[in-house]
Structures are given as C-alpha cells and as structure tokens.
Amino acid sequence: MNRIVLIGNGFDLAHGLKTSYKNFIDWYWKDWGEKLLHGLNKTETDGLCSFKIKDNVEVLNWASVFQGWYYRRENPLIPWNVNDVIHLVKENKDLCDYWISPFLQQICKSIETKKWVDIENEYYDLLSKCALKGNTETTVEVLNQQLHTLQEKLVQYLSLVNKTDTKICESIWDKIYSPINPKEISVEKFFQLKEYIDWCMKQDNSYWASKMQRYKEEFDSDYVDNYKKNCHKIYYVNYPRPFMLPDHIMLLSFNYTKTVHLYHNQNFFLNYIHGELNKPQNIIFGYGDEIDENYQALKNLNDNGCLCNLKTIKYLETDNYRNALAFMDSAPYQVCIMGHSCGNSDRTLLNTLFEHKNCLSIKPYYYIKEDGTDNYLDIIQNISRNFTDMKLMRDRVVNKSYCEPLISM
C-alpha cells in the first residue's frame, strides 16, 4: 500500500511563509508604490493597471511628484510609505487617470469582501464570461496576457519568499511517514487490506528489515514473528508497524516553493506537479476544471486562446503528470491532504486521484482557526465537488474522528 500526500498552499502558510494570493496582491501594490516613487515616465503601466499623470499637471515624471514638485511635506527626508503612495494616487483624481483591468479589479474585490481570493478561479470565471456570454469588458487575448503578467509577478514574489529560512515541523514529518490506520480505509476497499495482510504474512524478515531501513528505523523481528504466530488472536488494528507503513510515498506538491524539500526522504518520491521556481518555464498557472459545464462550451469554440491556460494541456509539457498517474496505477494508495483546499482550479486532477480504482481513502488534515473552530467541513465540501459519485465520496473520505490538525495551536 502506498500514500500520496497532497501539498497545498496551507502547507507553506503552516511554516510561517506569506504565500497566500492576498499576500501576493499586497506585495503587488507595494511594488507599484516603489515604481511610482522612482518612475521616470508620466504614464506607468503593466497591462493590469496604469497610472497616467494628467496633462495639466506640470511635473516631469512620477518621481518628481514625490520629490516635492507636487506633494510637499514638512520633512522631505522621511521616506515615503509605499502604501501611502498608492492610496494617495488612487484617490487623487486631479493628479492622474487611474485605470484597473476588470481581471485585477475582480481579484481585489474578492480580497476586500472575502479576505481571500483564488486567482485561477477568477481567471476562469472572466474567461467564461468573455468567451461565452458576450462580456465586452476585455478579450480572451488580453485576459491571457494579463494572466501571464500575474504569473511572472507571482514567480517574482514567491522567489523572494522562497529565501526565507524554514524549519522542519517534527509533527508534520511524523504524519507524512506514519503507518496507515486500518480504520481509515474505505469499506469498499477493505478486501484489499485483507489481501495485502495475507501477502505480508508470506514475506520474510529480510523484506521488512529493508523496508524499515528506507524509513531509517530499526526493525523488530520479534514483534513481527510474534504477530505471525498469534494473528488469529489479535484484533485487526494491531497489525505490525512494518506492515502498515506505506511501501512508497509520493509528495505531490502543488506549490512552487522549496518548503516541501524539508520533508523529502530520498527513498521516496517528490513531484512538483505545477513546476518549481527554479524552472519558471515549467510553471503551470491556469484552470483545471474539465467537469464544469462551461469547459465543453469553451472547447467547442475552436479558439485555442480559450484552452492555452488549461492545466491538462500544460501537464503535457513535463513528465510530472505521467509520473503521478503511474504512481496511482502501481498499487492501492491513501491520499493525505496537507494544506490543499481541493478547490475547483485543480478539479480534473483531483477527480482522477479521488475516484481512481486504487484510492483506498482520503484523509484531510485541517486547520484550527484563532477562534477555536476549524476548516474540516470546508475541505470536505470542496472534496465533494471533485467527485461525480457521491456514494464513493462518503465511503472514501476519512471521518473527522480519525483526522487531526496539520499543526496544533
């Protein structure tokens, strides 16, 4: 039996990294503040928004606006706060014409109202409106260019975050490399557990010693021998540790950062399914929901621009997806979810993982909020959207009594 560990953004957040899209957008505006403070043109733009000094304002460029030619301060030696710069410029309609694209505006609106945003979902929603519903605010070509710009900015931001020193959380390591609890296996797949235990009983101690070596643990042959002699007397939950440790583990990271490397035992697999920061040409950033009814309509438009940011197509640029699929096909596996929201932007891949014939169970590790509540139900609701068979979902998802927080408060 194997294990696939889904590593999402919450995994980085649990290590103190500011990797949420909200963190990214906050940095984006601060970066704009720096640009305007030192801008050598009267119009500054990046395709997502623009700041154009009005013709009747007699300044040379944006830098001069903040060097005393427009804004005068009692103490000009005090550095400008970049957040103040952006706020002043956006609000001062006498100074400049400020334009923001519908895409960026929707992202910022989501952050303002919900305190979070999924940029990939916002892209897909606007793409559907633009291509299918006659929304004339933008075009598919312009929207794709704006997503590309955001991707470049995101890589730039995360590359800065990636320099942060992070440390292993021992409790997370223990969860990744823990035995599979038989009670977590779905009822439908329990026969496979019995077949697996029957197979285990036939293996000699040299096999188990080799397996434990991969986990860098000592092998207690007496415990296994004793179990084999008395197994007919022992309740099934007491299987020996070597039996229930996964034979192989794949850390399937949806992040671009290096944090997951801290937990990579060289005897197992690490798969950056969406690429990594040191290979920006392989970064996958787009939408991955082929189950949604709008997807078929987009495909039928015969416009490649509607499909160029489809994750399924992007997966063909590397071996990462094929390696994940080969791992799924190789043996029964448990899915453990660590920091992945299981949202619709990865729906196609998650559906393949969750409904695969070899999937034994799906165990989410949840997050405890400051008020003491947790997001277990939020994760389960998102998981349910990745299933087409709800009976299968109810059987495979591990109930909360056997789940636990990713990290304790």
Q: Model-flagged regions — what are they?
A:
Residues 15, 21, 28, 277, ...:
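Solvent-exposed, flexible loop/coil residues
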Residues 2, 9, 236-237, 245, ...:
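Sparse, context-dependent recognition of short Cys/His-centered cofactor- or disulfide-binding micro-motifs
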Residues 41-316:
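Extended, H/D-rich, highly charged conserved domains that either
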Residues 1-15, 21-24, 39-49, 323-409:
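SIR2/sirtuin-family catalytic core signature
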Residues 315-318, 343-344:
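Conserved phosphate-coordination/catalytic loops
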